[in-house]
């Protein structure tokens, strides 16, 4: 990889979402460096056409070395812990990794050639809200994971005012599904992602699914979420980076389809695709909110983006297909 070329660093590039972003960057003939400590990333998700560096964003000296040696001009920053329940019980771990890790990255950018950064944020920073959410809504993080994303956003905005680079903050809604290529998908099982769990259960003789809370202030009592296909989300990062390069204007955008599905609705769709599933209702999880879905007007206007996979049945089917491949 020539040092004179402008290269893109993807932190967390061996993870679920990161690997899909890397896949599309490589498809676009970009020079990509993946930084991942493989704590929540996986070797099998590392794209062989990218340069992989096993490192931790908490290791500031290593980040300096990577950005200098590979002449990084743009960063897509995904490296973070993201288990909502774990965050409530281990705040120090999440503070050090998600907040201090982001701070390290920003401080290293001061004396570098980095021009743009895309940050992986979360719709959870809005807190417990009703209906469609636009980007102007005041942040009100309810759980500690959401708080780490909010604080990281604030660090990026503050740093950008004092330095030359531009930023794109992407507030993800619920990411699901797997790449149409069939080469990558979600491996981690511990995050409690509904569609991932259903895909796992689809391969069992007697599938079971836990629903955390059926007493929320929603139509059927279960949480409502805006599910977005991971390959569509990856495409948003590509278009977001292009926008920063072409327009030199920072942005904050919601990343969803603008349509909410309840947990029960997702389970019912799964039943139609596959088979019956034993539903087991549990207590609410700490940090979970009742309903959240995106207002996508600004999102589509700025990036001129149109989804390719915005079909919930297709999303679930792609997750099941990936799960079958993992098992085999």
Model-identified regions with their sequence ranges:
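N-terminal Rossmann-like NAD(P)+-binding domain of SDR-like oxidoreductases, especially those catalyzing
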Residues: 1-176
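Short, solvent-exposed loop/helix junctions and linker helices
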Residues: 11, 96-99, 188, 192, ...
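Histidine-centered active-site/metal-ligand motif
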Residues: 20, 77, 193, 229, ...
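Short, flexible, glycine-rich and Lys/Arg-enriched loop motifs at helix boundaries
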Residues: 43, 173-194, 206-225
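Short-chain dehydrogenase/reductase
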Residues: 95, 142-150, 184-196, 226-227
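Basic phosphate/pyrophosphate-binding loop/patch that engages nucleotide-derived ligands
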Residues: 110, 158-162, 191-195, 199-202
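C-terminal substrate-binding subdomain of Rossmann-fold SDR/epimerase-dehydratase oxidoreductases
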Residues: 197-328
């Amino acid at each position: 990889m020539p040092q004179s070329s402008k290269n893109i660093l993807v932190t967390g590039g061996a993870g679920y979402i990161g690997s899909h972003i890397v896949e599309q960057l490589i498809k676009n003939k970009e020079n990509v460096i993946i930084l991942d400590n493989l704590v929540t990333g996986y070797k099998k998700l590392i794209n062989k056409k990218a340069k992989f560096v096993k490192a931790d964003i908490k290791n500031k000296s290593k980040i300096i070395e990577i950005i200098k040696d590979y002449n990084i001009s743009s960063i897509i920053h995904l490296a973070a812990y993201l288990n909502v329940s774990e965050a409530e019980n281990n705040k120090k771990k999440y503070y050090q990794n998600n907040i201090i890790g982001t701070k390290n990255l920003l401080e290293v950018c001061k004396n570098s050639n980095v021009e743009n950064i895309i940050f992986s944020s979360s719709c959870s920073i809005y807190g417990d809200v009703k209906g469609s959410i636009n980007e102007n809504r005041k942040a009100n993080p309810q759980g500690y994971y959401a708080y780490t994303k909010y604080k990281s956003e604030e660090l990026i905005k503050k740093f950008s005012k004092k330095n030359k680079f531009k930023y794109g903050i992407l507030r993800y809604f619920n990411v699901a599904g797997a790449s149409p290529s069939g080469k990558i998908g979600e491996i981690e099982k511990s995050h409690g992602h509904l569609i991932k769990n259903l895909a796992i259960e689809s391969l069992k003789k007697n599938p079971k699914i836990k629903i955390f809370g059926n007493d929320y202030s929603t139509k059927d009592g279960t949480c409502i979420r805006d599910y977005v296909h991971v390959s569509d989300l990856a495409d948003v990062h590509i278009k977001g980076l292009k926008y920063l390069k072409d327009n030199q204007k920072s942005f904050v955008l919601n990343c969803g389809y603008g349509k909410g599905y309840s947990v029960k609705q997702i389970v019912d769709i799964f039943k139609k695709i596959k088979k019956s599933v034993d539903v087991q209702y549990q207590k609410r999880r700490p940090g979970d909110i009742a309903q959240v879905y995106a207002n996508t007007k600004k999102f589509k206007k700025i990036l001129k983006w149109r989804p390719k996979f915005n079909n919930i049945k297709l999303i679930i089917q792609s997750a099941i297909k990936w799960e079958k491949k993992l098992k085999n």
